[in-house]
């Protein structure tokens, strides 16, 4: 069977995209329908391309059903902020929106260096998007079957190199935006334009866009805070004398899978070789187009680039990319892939400016009793002269602070609970997805439960005498993998309320996946397993050996070398 006729029956989503008039669908009519807080089933898929998902409060679902009311629908909107960089003025706008147009009264930092709002009513969607637009922010392509928010190392210590890496992240984000005018027409009030053929409106995507979401990241070694190997396309910066000369390109990563379906699996990206900086767009576009043309449009669970590469083979995929790019890969350059954590506290850059990284538990920016975090960041934004950076670990950097401004910034941070609390190495490296009560896919808690769970793990580390050592722990409410749990030394993936699958064995640096160790277990069982494993680790580990590497070397779990073959075995 040839590539051209592989797909015999298109998925429903493919028909929706084809018939949507370039992502317009019935969204505008749905906005004007006051009898329900929801959109139609088809438009619920299309609104993702505009940056938001329809949700409901699952804590109230049964109560409202008994009252014969429809679910309490609301929307989660995710902004597009390439590399996580925004100005203080923009942040003040982001902050005001959260308190005036959402019911959550909070801002949620994501694992892809942007922010999202929860609890938006349908009637407030247009006003919210227009408010973002006034601050030069938008949500187009933050979700949907397109290139999503592009990540970039946010720790600006090597300022020149970071600036060059950020340039490419921003360029990739801008160039691969959908070209349809639907977003501007529906949300910003632009005049409707007559549409033409797909290639004219969407010269890269066409009228059916990509088969599935596509994620890009730019890493600046030795930092791997962006988890570059978990992306569809990863660019690992290669520098000479502090100047960017090109990238080691990796492709085919992705975290999502489905419980009980062994044909789905997480996967880390393959190394394809070195590319010169000036060839970056040639290769990026070639990979996007190969995925557009070769990707599975019949079964969405098999539609990510990782499955395309597995299906067609590494060599065939590489050859096709080189053919379309008109350039061949060079042998990859030697780089060191290191820590995935953030540098907390003050760090001085080579330009003599200071950068303050603030730990944000669960990425949730909200005023809490004794910790008015949101107010604190608002006050900092009022006086800060540099910029802000959101990290892929759900934290917040006050970047580019002059020496004379440090004291005032730190005073505000401490007075509002943003500094001063001891953060263990493990907690500082651990992340969780939102999960309940808003995510429709969640099978178990994550964000609301994770801090207390971490406290119990920290107690076990203290008990066994290695509390000063960091372990990468991640929790998600389902196997879609938003918090990249399959790349964690300890991964917890929701299976049912209060129950999780326990995965072990990923590398500390994010260069090896973990593997299922125990299935569908509750907290007491999880902690019991970790208690025993920590005891073994302390007594049997080799010098400098990380916990993830120990669990593989000691035979607790097998190493995942080829996810398609051995993740589920």
Swiss-Prot record:
Q: Which GO terms describe its molecular function?
A: 4 iron, 4 sulfur cluster binding; heme binding; metal ion binding; NADP binding; sulfite reductase (ferredoxin) activity; sulfite reductase (NADPH) activity
Cofactor names: siroheme; [4Fe-4S] cluster
Under Enzyme Commission nomenclature, its number is 1.8.1.2
UniProt cross-references to InterPro entries, sorted A to Z = CysI, NiRdtase/SiRdtase_haem-b_fer, Nit/Sulf_reduc_fer-like_dom_sf, NO2/SO3_Rdtase_4Fe4S_dom, NO2/SO3_Rdtase_4Fe4S_prot, NO2/SO3_Rdtase_4Fe4S_sf, NO2/SO3_Rdtase_FeS/sirohaem_BS
Catalytically driven reaction(s)? hydrogen sulfide + 3 NADP(+) + 3 H2O = sulfite + 3 NADPH + 4 H(+)
Pathway as given in its UniProt record:
Sulfur metabolism; hydrogen sulfide biosynthesis; hydrogen sulfide from sulfite (NADPH route): step 1/1
User: TM segments?
Assistant: none
Q: Which residues bind [4Fe-4S] cluster?
A: 433, 439, 478, 482
Q: Which GO terms describe its cellular component?
A: sulfite reductase complex (NADPH)
Q: Does the keyword NADP apply?
A: yes
Does the keyword field hold Oxidoreductase? Answer: yes
Cofactor binding note: Binds 1 siroheme per subunit. Binds 1 [4Fe-4S] cluster per subunit.
Residues engaged in binding siroheme: 482
Q: How does it assemble?
A: Alpha(8)-beta(8). The alpha component is a flavoprotein, the beta component is a hemoprotein.
Q: What family does the Swiss-Prot or TrEMBL record give for this protein?
A: Belongs to the nitrite and sulfite reductase 4Fe-4S domain family.
* Physiological role: Component of the sulfite reductase complex that catalyzes the 6-electron reduction of sulfite to sulfide. This is one of several activities required for the biosynthesis of L-cysteine from sulfate.
HAMAP family, alphabetized: CysI
The protein here is known as Sulfite reductase [NADPH] hemoprotein beta-component
